[in-house]
């Protein structure tokens, strides 16, 4: 059994195990090596692994819609929030299991330094220059939308 977890080369691909064994395998690799990125073929498969692994250890989910056309038409707010929560957790502590699908893996992401610099904190009672705030939001990639 020890040879099974003695991986010398990354990335590695695991085939031929049932879902429960793959889950245990991923958890054991995490315990031995630390951070692990699990890339699944589909969003459904990634969600299945996330549900299974999160029962045993804390892990993060980075979901992206499987189809580019659906991203262009309408971005799911739930998926977007989950991705932001995952990125925020990774900035705090990068020793995690992150589970994503192929589209999540291919997604362009900012560097950690740029992501940290883009953090805006506005508290109740703060005075904010609306023009500076709008310009900052534009710089971060937001766009103005009519309601």
Enumerate the predicted regions with their spans.
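ASCE RecA-like P-loop NTPase motor cores
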Residues: 1-147
């Amino acid at each position: 059994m020890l040879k099974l977890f003695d991986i010398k080369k990354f990335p590695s691909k695991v085939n031929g195990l049932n879902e429960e064994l793959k889950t245990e395998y991923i958890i054991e690799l995490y315990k031995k090596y630390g951070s692990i990125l699990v890339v699944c073929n589909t969003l459904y498969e990634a969600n299945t692994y996330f549900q299974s692994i999160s029962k045993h250890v804390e892990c993060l989910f980075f979901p992206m819609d499987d189809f580019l056309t659906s991203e262009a038409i309408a971005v799911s707010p739930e998926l977007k929030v989950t991705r932001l929560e995952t990125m925020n957790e990774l900035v705090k502590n990068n020793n995690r299991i992150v589970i994503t699908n192929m589209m999540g893996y291919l997604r362009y992401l900012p560097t950690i330094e740029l992501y940290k610099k883009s953090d805006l904190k506005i508290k109740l009672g703060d005075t904010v220059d609306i023009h500076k705030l709008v310009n900052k939001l534009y710089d971060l990639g937001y766009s103005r939308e009519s309601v």
